[in-house]
Structures are given as C-alpha cells and as structure tokens.
From Swiss-Prot:
Encoding gene, per UniProt annotation: rps11
Natural source organism: Tetradesmus obliquus (Green alga)
Domain of life: Eukaryota
Record GO biological process: translation
Name recorded for this polypeptide: Small ribosomal subunit protein uS11c
InterPro entries documented for this protein: Ribosomal_uS11 (IPR001971), Ribosomal_uS11_sf (IPR036967)
Length: 130
C-alpha cells in the first residue's frame, strides 16, 4: 500500500493593519475596549471582567487600565500604529484607558466622544429608601 502524505496547513497569518479604530465603552459597572480595522471588523477586544475583575472592582480605573493593556498588547500582532478612539459611556475608566493606549505607542489621530445625551428620554428609576 502506498503511504499517504498529510498536507500540513500553515498557521493562520495575522493580517497587517496599520490603522484602526479603538472603541472604549465605559459603563457604570464595566469597561469594554474593542480594536477594529477601518472597515469595522473586530480584530480583538478585552474588558475588565475578561481580565479577572469581578463585582464592583470591574468599575475601577485600575481594571480599565488592565483591559487597555491587554488590547494594546494584542494590537502589536496586527502591526497597528495609528488609531481613532471613540469613547462612549459615563464610566470611570475612560481617561485611564485612553492614557494606556497612548503609552502603548499607538499614534492617536482623533478622540471622539459619542456618549448619548437624552432629550428627556426614559423615566429614571425611583429613589432608594434605605
């Protein structure tokens, strides 16, 4: 019988994207950071919860810093050197996450604030009586 040779497929090659968009969603309870290319296809993401923080520690600035470090480390695989930053939400980790992206050596073109402001939208929850 003839021996069959197995074809070894090469490992998946990461696409080189030199420009991208960093989305920072800073909520009251968590900070989610997403890195996408200019078409909007997600390359990588991280959050305070994914970095191991639980409960009210997810809302801290330190947790947002760690999440931004993880995304910055992953961005090196894609050779990202220029980015737009789009920030949404009222959370604490906004400025800390932006600072970490600067520290990673990514050149930032634009920082855009996209937090929605209601024009007398939803009724707020009732006041707590403790």
């Amino acid at each position: 019988m003839a021996r069959q040779t197995r074809k070894v497929s090469p490992t998946k090659i990461k696409k080189r994207t030199y420009r991208g968009i960093v989305y920072i969603q800073a909520g009251h309870h968590n900070t989610i950071i997403t890195l996408a290319n200019l078409r909007g296809e997600v390359l990588c993401w991280s959050s305070a919860g994914a970095c191991g923080f639980r409960g009210k520690r997810k809302a801290t600035t330190f947790a947002a810093k760690k999440a931004a470090e993880v995304v910055a480390k992953k961005s090196r695989e894609f050779a990202l050197n220029e980015a737009k930053i789009l920030v949404t939400g009222p959370g604490q980790g906004r400025e800390t996450a932006i600072r970490e992206i600067f520290k990673a050596g990514i050149k930032v073109n634009v920082i855009r604030e996209k937090t929605g402001i209601p024009h007398n939208g939803c009724r707020p929850p009732k006041k707590r009586r403790v």
